[in-house]
Amino acid sequence: MSVINDLFSNVAEFRKYVPGISANIEFAELSSSAISARKQISAIITPELWKLIKEEVTTTDAKEYLRNAFGNLIMHKSLIFDIISKRKSETADVYKHEFEAMRRQYIDNYYNAMDSLIQELTENEIYSSKWKETHDYKLLQELQIQTTADFNSYYGIDLSYLFFFRTIPLQREILLDGLGDMFTEVLSIDPARADLTGKLKLALSQLVVALALSRFDIIELPATIRSLFDDQKSSRSASDEQNRVLRLAADLRENAKSIISAVELVLSEPDESHIVSETSFNRPDDKIYLI
């Protein structure tokens, strides 16, 4: 049985979730893309949760989201082969802007479905116990930004559950690399300094996004960030896109460093709340007071 049959019984069912597929397409043509897509999604939600959702008898929200994500990711991966096949057979020709529009739509469909799926895994009791046992979820306790909403308040990620959970290891890496010590220092000096903690979280969010830009495929980025590289794509080359990605990552790192430097400056200033002067030694039981 083909991997694609994990979630789709036939092409007609597949077509319900994936727009714009050829009328004569066969599952055998999509097999290699399906293997890659299942591996990619299973790496995020774990093979155990994939199996649990796949084996559900009724059509649950989680199964619908997974079908949407799986189907659209398959087509995103196989689209280029489909177009080349049509061109070779001279049955159809697809312009570059049409190819890019289809590609973006499959990415958007996949991303939105995965966002909804991860939110469902987090909030639905049927899945949440297994989801919270995953390695990345357990790492949340070590992080300074522990929710999607909190991260989104510092750097706009379209409230993307997918992006937030994919960046858990990145946030941990940045904290272990030294930024975590600054959070500890701020709390040890004055736990009430929420302004300094907020500035450090702002810097942390920017460093996380910068690291994601250098390590993630573009389909793993929120729509707001992807849109920065999608405009006027027909007139740009792959190297142009990569340069824009690297430039944005560099800008974010520089901005984060400036914020961190400002916090370091505040922490290095002497504490003026306990000023020692001659009158500080006056005590009521002294016969002679220092004036």
Regions found by a protein language model. Give the residues of each.
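Conserved short "hinge" loops at termini or chain/domain junctions
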Residues: 1-71, 77-205, 211-291
